[in-house]
């Protein structure tokens, strides 16, 4: 039995892949450094943090980024022996404009030295990369800043060329979303004769949901699942897992389908979630009409999920107490914005201690001594 959430605490916007017998989930980190957290599992139940790819200035420098900006909704994929990571560095998110720059980096090892970033576009956020045979397709939601227009302007699709390292060809707006609005977080999948488009809708608060649409042509038009949302908590305030949405799916070697999604666990009656947005998992199946459904029925998230048909693989637990007689900080430590933490801390100045050097004020958005 798998108990949700599988990634507790601040781990929103999960993107999941399987590489042979290994499963990886990438999650957002916003203004916390290093950027993007990647967890690893072999049984979909036990997870460990194995990589934080955006760990040098060339890949990410968030000095000056406002609160809640930075890394939004990464997308992790794998093709022909290479890991691909698409990510957004948001420089501003208030008002009518959003400065959201989308990049691609690659690596042959999940915990290796990731390549120099390739800037793809800056037209929106929640980017995704879909590998379709010998073609690769880039998706993102488009942010429409024009007065009088829906800022969530639809899901854009454009081909990515591996040789030139650029987007190429026409841009297609393939899906404008449903009446829920706030259409974002696109992921594409191919099954039999259909392309399936998964999006998040309703905003990332208590109306959040996941919607499937499909088409026989990758450019659309896409028809929405006539049965409604694949997953949502919006109609049941008594659920322990609220704000369910923004997710991805993965298939096991035995053909079992699992969906990961963000959620939160609010304090009773207060609608406040001190643990932030977390990652949960649900078991799913393809119904006779070719739509993905939750195995347990309905479209609300379950706190427990039947055990996957995989050999249990627990990891050694991290120590509850850390003595600072170490050469470097463990990977579960983070700090704000800067790629140069050596400017404000030391593990050698006093043996067995983590020493912080005072920097800028608490409201500053450049360099604070906070770990």
Segments (PLM) and residue ranges:
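Beta-rich catalytic cores
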Residues: 10-13, 34, 70-72, 123-126, ...
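Repeat-solenoid scaffold signature
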Residues: 231, 235-288
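Blade-edge beta-strand/turn elements of extracellular beta-propeller
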Residues: 1-7, 46-65, 104-122, 159-181, ...
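Blade-loop segments of beta-propeller domains
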Residues: 44, 48-92
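Structural motif
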Residues: 33-38, 94-103, 147-157, 205-214, ...
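Hydrophobic core segments of beta-strands in well-ordered, beta-rich domains
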Residues: 16-32, 72-95, 116-120, 128-151, ...
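Extracellular glycan-recognition regions
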Residues: 288-371
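Short, Lys/Arg-rich amphipathic segments at extreme N-termini
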Residues: 1-23
């Amino acid at each position: 039995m798998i108990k949700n959430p599988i990634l507790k605490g601040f781990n929103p916007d999960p993107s999941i892949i399987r590489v042979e017998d290994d499963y990886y989930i990438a999650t957002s980190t916003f203004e916390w450094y290093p950027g993007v957290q990647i967890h690893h599992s072999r049984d979909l139940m036990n997870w460990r943090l194995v990589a934080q790819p955006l760990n040098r200035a060339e890949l990410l420098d968030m000095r000056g980024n406002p609160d809640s900006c930075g890394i939004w909704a990464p997308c992790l994929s794998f093709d022909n022996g290479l890991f691909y990571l698409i990510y957004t560095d948001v420089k501003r998110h208030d008002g009518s404009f959003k400065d959201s720059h989308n990049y691609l980096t690659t690596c042959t090892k999940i915990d290796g030295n990731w390549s120099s970033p390739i800037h793809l576009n800056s037209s929106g956020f929640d980017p995704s990369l879909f590998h379709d045979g010998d073609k690769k397709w880039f998706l993102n939601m488009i942010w429409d800043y024009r007065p009088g227009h829906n800022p969530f302007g639809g899901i854009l699709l454009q081909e990515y060329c591996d040789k030139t390292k650029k987007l190429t060809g026409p841009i297609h707006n393939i899906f404008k979303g449903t009446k829920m609005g706030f259409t974002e977080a696109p992921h594409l999948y191919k099954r039999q004769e259909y392309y399936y488009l998964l999006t998040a809708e309703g905003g990332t608060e208590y109306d959040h949901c996941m919607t499937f649409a499909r088409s026989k042509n990758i450019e659309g038009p896409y028809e929405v699942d006539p049965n409604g949302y694949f997953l949502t908590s919006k109609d049941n305030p008594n659920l322990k897992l609220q704000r369910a949405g923004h997710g991805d799916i993965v298939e096991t070697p035995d053909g079992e389908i699992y969906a990961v999604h963000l959620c939160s666990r609010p304090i009773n009656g207060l609608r406040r979630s001190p643990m932030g947005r977390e990652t949960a998992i649900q078991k799913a199946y393809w119904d006779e009409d070719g739509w993905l459904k939750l195995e347990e029925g309905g479209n609300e998230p379950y706190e427990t999920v039947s055990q996957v048909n995989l050999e249990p693989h627990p990891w050694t637990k991290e120590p509850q107490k850390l003595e600072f007689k170490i050469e470097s900080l463990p990977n579960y430590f983070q700090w704000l914005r800067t790629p140069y933490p050596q400017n404000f801390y030391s593990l050698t100045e006093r043996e067995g201690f983590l020493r912080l050097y005072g920097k800028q004020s608490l409201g500053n958005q450049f360099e604070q001594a906070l770990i």
